[in-house]
């Protein structure tokens, strides 16, 4: 009997030991790549990359990651796939499983991701959904670890609105046991399902509306663009979110050596000022690079190639 595939769908679905092994593998492979000693454990493997919408960072980072590991990526767009509109998602999963060795999908509908994973016989990786963005937060955790050491016991502050990146930060807080302080406008706060999960899981997460209270004494300050994928509200959201901008005054409330993170692309002058994103505490381009390295760790883990 063949064993079940190792899916990477959400951070809170995996044991801490597995998550740490991915980060350790990411660090090791990054060091090898920088030393011109590439590790190629995925020779002969093929990754299908499904994109419902155009993508830059996710597409390039997964493409390069798979190639650096010795494998071959194949890109499929939503227009080519007609995912769930012609052939069912379940049948698509079964067919692709006969052709490729793993599937990475970037799709808004999280339930479609779950259906794909339930029917695939090869590993499925969540490249992003409207509900969560675990690959990004694994890159963020790797970045924090590189600059400041283990994140356990530290304090991370999120200021802005509720979105998929915040959800994955919440999942990480529950697993890695760091304090997550969240500040959002009341109308853009985490929804009931997330609030219920926080309560049930006992995750060390504080939800509030005051950005200064959230950031005070933090080791890391995180924000994201105020208009997420698919959002059509514009001016109203910006007006509501103005008090949540990360600027020099807000950063001064965090610890002196606090890091600033943003998954990019950033709307400068909106959720963050130039002074902060270009300042000495900002690690946003390290985060962007670490999408590549973190995803190499995830891919290697999916194929049982983590040493």
Swiss-Prot record:
<feature type="binding site">
    <location>
        <position position="82"/>
    </location>
    <ligand>
        <name>carbamoyl phosphate</name>
    </ligand>
</feature>
<keyword id="KW-0808">Transferase</keyword>
<feature type="binding site">
    <location>
        <begin position="133"/>
        <end position="136"/>
    </location>
    <ligand>
        <name>carbamoyl phosphate</name>
    </ligand>
</feature>
<dbReference type="InterPro" id="IPR024904">
    <property type="entry name" value="OTCase_ArgI"/>
</dbReference>
<dbReference type="Pfam" id="PF00185">
    <property type="entry name" value="OTCace"/>
</dbReference>
<dbReference type="InterPro" id="IPR006132">
    <property type="entry name" value="Asp/Orn_carbamoyltranf_P-bd"/>
</dbReference>
<feature type="binding site">
    <location>
        <position position="224"/>
    </location>
    <ligand>
        <name>L-ornithine</name>
    </ligand>
</feature>
<keyword id="KW-0028">Amino-acid biosynthesis</keyword>
<dbReference type="InterPro" id="IPR036901">
    <property type="entry name" value="Asp/Orn_carbamoylTrfase_sf"/>
</dbReference>
<feature type="binding site">
    <location>
        <position position="291"/>
    </location>
    <ligand>
        <name>carbamoyl phosphate</name>
    </ligand>
</feature>
<feature type="binding site">
    <location>
        <begin position="263"/>
        <end position="264"/>
    </location>
    <ligand>
        <name>carbamoyl phosphate</name>
    </ligand>
</feature>
<keyword id="KW-0963">Cytoplasm</keyword>
<keyword id="KW-0055">Arginine biosynthesis</keyword>
<protein>
    <recommendedName>
        <fullName>Ornithine carbamoyltransferase</fullName>
        <ecNumber>2.1.3.3</ecNumber>
    </recommendedName>
</protein>
<dbReference type="GO" id="GO:0005737">
    <property type="term" value="C:cytoplasm"/>
</dbReference>
<dbReference type="GO" id="GO:0042450">
    <property type="term" value="P:arginine biosynthetic process via ornithine"/>
</dbReference>
<comment type="pathway">
    <text>Amino-acid biosynthesis; L-arginine biosynthesis; L-arginine from L-ornithine and carbamoyl phosphate: step 1/3.</text>
</comment>
<dbReference type="InterPro" id="IPR002292">
    <property type="entry name" value="Orn/put_carbamltrans"/>
</dbReference>
<dbReference type="GO" id="GO:0019240">
    <property type="term" value="P:citrulline biosynthetic process"/>
</dbReference>
<comment type="function">
    <text>Reversibly catalyzes the transfer of the carbamoyl group from carbamoyl phosphate (CP) to the N(epsilon) atom of ornithine (ORN) to produce L-citrulline.</text>
</comment>
<dbReference type="InterPro" id="IPR006131">
    <property type="entry name" value="Asp_carbamoyltransf_Asp/Orn-bd"/>
</dbReference>
<feature type="binding site">
    <location>
        <begin position="55"/>
        <end position="58"/>
    </location>
    <ligand>
        <name>carbamoyl phosphate</name>
    </ligand>
</feature>
<feature type="binding site">
    <location>
        <position position="106"/>
    </location>
    <ligand>
        <name>carbamoyl phosphate</name>
    </ligand>
</feature>
<comment type="similarity">
    <text>Belongs to the aspartate/ornithine carbamoyltransferase superfamily. OTCase family.</text>
</comment>
<feature type="binding site">
    <location>
        <begin position="228"/>
        <end position="229"/>
    </location>
    <ligand>
        <name>L-ornithine</name>
    </ligand>
</feature>
<dbReference type="GO" id="GO:0016597">
    <property type="term" value="F:amino acid binding"/>
</dbReference>
<dbReference type="GO" id="GO:0004585">
    <property type="term" value="F:ornithine carbamoyltransferase activity"/>
</dbReference>
<feature type="binding site">
    <location>
        <position position="164"/>
    </location>
    <ligand>
        <name>L-ornithine</name>
    </ligand>
</feature>
<dbReference type="InterPro" id="IPR006130">
    <property type="entry name" value="Asp/Orn_carbamoylTrfase"/>
</dbReference>
<dbReference type="GO" id="GO:0006526">
    <property type="term" value="P:L-arginine biosynthetic process"/>
</dbReference>
<dbReference type="Pfam" id="PF02729">
    <property type="entry name" value="OTCace_N"/>
</dbReference>
